[in-house]
Amino acid sequence: MERAQCLRKGILSFERSLEQRSLILSPRLEYSGAITAHCSLDLLDSTNPPASAFWVVETTDTEDEREKKREITE
C-alpha cells in the first residue's frame, strides 16, 4: 500500500474514533500538535487467513500542551 493512501486511511480512522467518542473539536479550536500515522501490512502464508493491515494514528502534544497539563496536575 502506498504511503499517502495509508496516511489518508489512518487520518480517517482517527477522525472516526473522535466522532465515536464525541471529542470533535470546535471549528475555532486549532490543534498545534502533530498527527502521525503509520501502516503495517502483515502478509501471511497460504495456510493462514488473508493478509491484514493495521493502521495506527497518534497525536503528539506540543511542548506548550505538555506544560499546561503539568501545571494542571501540580
Curated annotation (Swiss-Prot):
Name this protein carries in UniProt: Putative uncharacterized protein encoded by LINC01549
Gene name of this polypeptide: LINC01549
